[in-house]
């Protein structure tokens, strides 16, 4: 009988070393992964099936939802039958080129964000590409705890997931250990186009679909040649949410960090000891920088679980009994109080309707109802009723007329 590391083929016996057996297993795994990738690409079908008239018309209708008040959207929807056929022909002939985006800036919580809004005709192609190509091919390589820009997930889903992982950690280690927080620097502006093209070659095996995905990146507005993805473009969101997937897989599978995840460019991970968190933090930062993804080292922190920590503007506290408290942004209450006083002055001057003020108050209430912030919400509503109703009892605002005093 041949030894355990020997293969008998006919009259010949091949003796393999340990290194050769490891290499053979690696090649078999690699071949199976490539076979699965090819099967996923084949399941999409050819170019004319992916960009069929029916699918493009369906996603063209979805592009109009919520923005039908715009004149450009009304013109687009009015000529959707003929326009879809024209745009489909350019895509199949590989002559489609995106139009220039409308550039504007937003100030979000004091931070200026440049936004590039694509033309609605390009949004139809972007939405078809994302839903029919990028999402089916990118999702299998993404970890479950990546909660940004995915159907069925979101920011509050990520908060619930953190609470579940904190509970898992508490049942095994109590309040011992620490949380590692990392932030990627200029995630969208510093994205390397070479990394995105490489992902297309690895995951999009259809040459026509790969060329279309490359075209979207090639014509994306970016201040630095070969670097940067715009905010406000749907393929840009899908590309960036899946960009760090290799490092995510290393953290979860090879480093075996059970409680870890991220929301776009904000990372967190729970460890049994502070030293382990620091050691793993240095290794993760090294791997990000080796991959060409910048890390904001100023925002990288290791916080003991006996202290509260902040993630995506929310404050998490693990108590001694194991209860997990989640509080919303404290700065939001300060802004809301200032705005209510400003709105009252504008309301007395006739510059703002009371309906707008009610809508703003409902938005603030809806935000803080998602957290353990009953006290903050109660104090904010007391201020609201004291300003607009002269300290009247807290009853339905729609049944009570505001005072001008």
What residue spans do the PLM features occupy?
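Short Gly/Ser/Thr- and Asp/Glu-enriched loop/turn motifs at secondary-structure junctions
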Residues: 101, 261-265, 297-298
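Right-hand nucleic-acid polymerase module
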Residues: 1-31, 118, 123, 127, ...
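Reverse-transcriptase-like RNA-dependent polymerase core
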Residues: 87-111, 208-221
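Active-site-proximal segment of RNA-dependent polymerases
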Residues: 43-46, 130-189
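Conserved polymerase palm-domain catalytic core
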Residues: 165-264, 268-283, 287, 303, ...
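Conserved pre-motif C helix in the palm subdomain of viral-like polymerases
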Residues: 112-143, 225-252
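Non-catalytic, polymerase-adjacent accessory regions of viral genome-replication enzymes
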Residues: 1-85, 401-405
